[in-house]
Structure formats: structure tokens, C-alpha cells
Amino acid sequence: MPNIKFRASRRTLTSHAGLSIIGQCFEIAGVDSIDSRFPTTLGMRTSDVIKSYLGLLCLGMSDYDAVENFRRDKPFQQLLTLQKVPSAATLRQRLEKLAANDLQARTATWSTTLLSLIEAPITAETTHVCLDIDTFVMDNSNSKKEGVSRTYQKVDGYTPIAAYLGNEGWCLGLELRPGKQHTMKESNAFLERVLPRAQCLTKQPILLREDSGFDSQAHLALLEQQRQVFADEGRRLDYVVKWNPRGSATADRDTWLAVAADYWEELRPGKRQALWTQTVSIHDDNKTEYVVQRVMRLVERTADRDGQLLLEPDYELEGWWTSLDEAPEAVIKRYQAHATHEQFHSEIKTDLDLERLPSGKFATNDLILHLAQLAYNILRLMGQLGMTGELSPVRHPAKRRRLRTVLQELVHRAALVIHKARQIIPRLRAGHRTHDGVEHLAKPPALSTRNAMLTVNRRHSIHKQFQATRDRQICRAWRVERHDKTGRQHRSARWVLAITGLRKPTCTGRMIKKCSLAVIGKVSAPASRIQVIVTTSFFLWLSVWRFCQRPCSTKSFIFLPSTSFFSA
């Protein structure tokens, strides 16, 4: 046995090298923009509190006390670009205060912004991109937390609702609900919030899949209305919702048998089924009539799979509301894939350690679930971009990696953190297969582009020295455009940015009102390394909003020297 000795080192070491990728995802999602909406006069910034807890979630930790282990961890602070790491008490108090101020409404756009800018892969199933919506149970038994009550699984806890897009399972909505709340309650409002997010991420037809808990005439009427809205925009929306037979199915058995008489087909000795499609009229709250179709399946068993004869036939009646113009077998097969989302529920509860929520207040736990939505998507993104295809670890091939696998292979990876030339370089062990995946994640297409589009907060003033006449605006913008086309630098065009896209600006002295501005231009470093610097002499707030490859236009410009407020 080798003689092993432990020694302390003054070098900066970390066992969570994957935080470097997670920190970049925070910047792209725009988490730092929360400081302007929730400013603080004393204490640490709001973004530091949020990113600290998001970092814990991305490490598979959810309790407040876990942050105490990272208060003196410099890599945790540096890789997540934190000024300070809060204590457990501060983290709890600030999250409760932010939840009372409805921070949940601000966090909804973070995931869609991240997925759209990174151009996350969204795989369709046959002809449609599936959007799965369902509730699940979080067991919080033996606790007195606010909102904990009896769930449909006969345990005390919560029943949150979630929405997942594509075969990858991108989470577009995750909201907390009391345990006793019915699935259908407030689901229409949730659907109206989720559908626009799905529209922003994919142009393909969307197939909404829901179980029998969403079977109501008001919900089906809303789906028909949303289909019309999609059609007016040149888009397509379809749905498959499991039918809830309730008590009428057994009472009208003779009627169903009479309808199925023409559709029977034998599957095996002692078992046969009938498949058919029927149209049903439904009404919304305003008594508006909608005609929808329903796929029906009636199964009759006179013997079990082992050949044992039954004393009397056993009947099973099922149905699916759908807008698909397909055969009944194809509709049923599409719905059967809906069960995959149960894996996503399990990952949220186990891999993110959110089965038992840490707070006793309902609003705070709801905020934690909203933050978990972003953490889930970040880890899912790391798995899709860094652990599939040729970058897959030595395991079975898969189209999607579990979050725990991402934590083990990419996040919990030891590294030596080096500071050099104003850069933070996590150095991994050479030759390890994980190194290729991490290096690929650090340079995805959206991060390595050299064109950056930014938005300007129009409520802040612009200093006089940065205003220009129209002639100078066009001249400076022409230099930027020429540099984009030829690659040659004209009077240090390497360090210039131009604000484009003015829509009816009204200039009054130092203020520019009623306008929408966007900054586009060349930078000499990857867009992920652009840092915003706000000074007292220049009250212009910029935030990285989008990356694009479009050349500058010369219609209406305001020229700004980028060296005044950027460092790359």
C-alpha cells in the first residue's frame, strides 16, 4: 500500500469546475439585470443572493445551510462573478423578502432568454415539437409548511405544475401549488403563460399533451381558441388530452358496446379491441360552441394473458381529445410518449434535491421552484451540448443525459484555478474525456460570436459628450459597416459600437425618450467576456441581450465609443 500523506496547498483549487460554465449561463440569461429592478442601498446585491442560491441548486443542494461551506470558497465566488457570498440567515431573509415582492414574475424570462441565445437543440417527435404539461407530487409529510395538504397520492405535500418542451425536456414553467389543489384549477392561466415561451423557442408545429386531469370543457375551448390564434400567425398548434370518462362510462356500457360493434379486432385469444373516432360539441363559459373530435378505444378481455378464462368479460374504455387528423393508432402512440415527462419530475425532486422544500413559507418555496427552473435548464443544456454524440462519456449511448450524470461528469470536476491576464482559467487534468466536453461547452456557437447586440435602458440619461449630429452618426456607422464587410479597421473600428434601430426618437437635451435602442457592432473579444461598467459620469445601462450576425444599417444611428464603458 502506498504511503499517502495529506498536505495543504496555497493554490486555488476547486472541486466544482463546472461552475465556470454555469456562471456564463447566468450572464447570458440576464440574472444581473435583477439589480436594477430590486436595488439595495445597503448589504449585498440582489443578483449575488440569487446567483448564490442558483449555484447551490446547480450543485444539487437546496437547503440554506449549504451556502456556509462556500462563504470562503474563492472559486465559487469568482466563477459565478459574485461580490459576496451570503450567509445562511441572509440567504433565507432575502429570498423571503424577494418572494414577497413577486420576484417570480421576473424570473420567467431567464430560461427562454438562455435557450434562445444559446440556440438550444429542440428535437421534434415526428412532425411536432411536444409540449407536455402535468402536475406531480412533492412529499413534505410531517411538516407544518404553508400550503402542505393531502395530495392525490394520499401523502401530505405540494402538487406543482410543470411544462416541458421537446424530447430534451426543456422546462418552460414550474409553479408551486398547494397539495389539495385540483389539477385543472388555474391551469388555463398557466397555459397562456407557457405557450408564448414555446413560440419564442421553436417555429415548428407544437403538440400539447396532457392527462385526464385537464379534461374540462373550458380548457378544451381555450385550446381551440389558441389554435385559432396560432393559425392567424401562420403557426400550427395541436393537442392530445386524455379523456376522463367519470361515471358515465360504466353506466352507458351497452351504448358503447353497440357503437364498437363495427370496429372489433382480435389482438390475441381472449382479447379484442375497437378503435373509432367521434365528434363532440362542447361549450365555453360564454356558451360558444366548439366541435372537437375524440378517439375512443374499448378493450374486451375474456381471458388473461396466461390463458385463464374469466367468469365474465372485463371492459376497459379510454378516450383522447385531439385535433390531429391522424389514425386512432397514431394518436394513441403519440400520447403514450407523454409518460417520458415523469423522468423530468424525478430529476427535479431527486437530482436538484427539491423533494422537501427548504422554507416554511409558500411564496418563498414558489420562488425557489422558479429558480430551480433555470438551474434545471442549465444542467440540461450542459448535458446536451457536452455529453452527447462524440463528447459522450464511456457509457451507453443516449439522446439525453440525466441531471445526476451531468453533475458527476461535468460539474463536480476538480480543477486548478489560475488567474492570468484578467482571465480565470480552470485547469483540468489533461487527457480526461470530460476535458473535451467542458472545453466544448466553454465555446458554444452563441458564446464565440464576435457580434454583440445590446439593449439600452431608455429611462437613464445620456451624457452630452456622447451625442452626435446625424452626419457624424452616418459616418461613424459606415465605418462599422465597412469593417463588418471587409474586416479592415478604419480609425480603430475594432473598438466601436453603434446604436441602431431608433423608432421615432424624441431628443430633449440629455434625455432620449420614446425610443427603442439596440447596440450592434464589432468587439475584439468573445461576447461572453464583455463586462458592463457603470460609472458616475456616464449613466447608461447596457445588458447583453442577443447575439447576431447581421451587418449594421445606416438608417438612424447614435455613435458611442465602446472603450468608455466596456472592458473585454
Language model segments and positions:
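Conserved nucleotidyltransferase catalytic core and NTase-mimicking acidic/glycine-rich helix/loop elements
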Residues: 378-411
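Short amphipathic alpha-helical "interface-anchor" segments enriched in bulky aromatics
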Residues: 67, 328-367, 371, 375-382
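Domain-level cores of phosphate- or acyl-group-handling catalytic modules
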Residues: 181-248
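An anionic, glycine-rich sequence signature occurring as long contiguous blocks
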Residues: 2-4, 8-11, 232-350, 440-451, ...
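Charged/polar low-complexity intrinsically disordered segments
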Residues: 64, 89, 467, 473, ...
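Dynamic "connector" segments at or just before major functional cores
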Residues: 1-156, 162-182, 187-201, 229, ...
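Short, conserved catalytic/metal-binding motifs centered on acidic residues
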Residues: 52-53, 67, 85-87, 91, ...
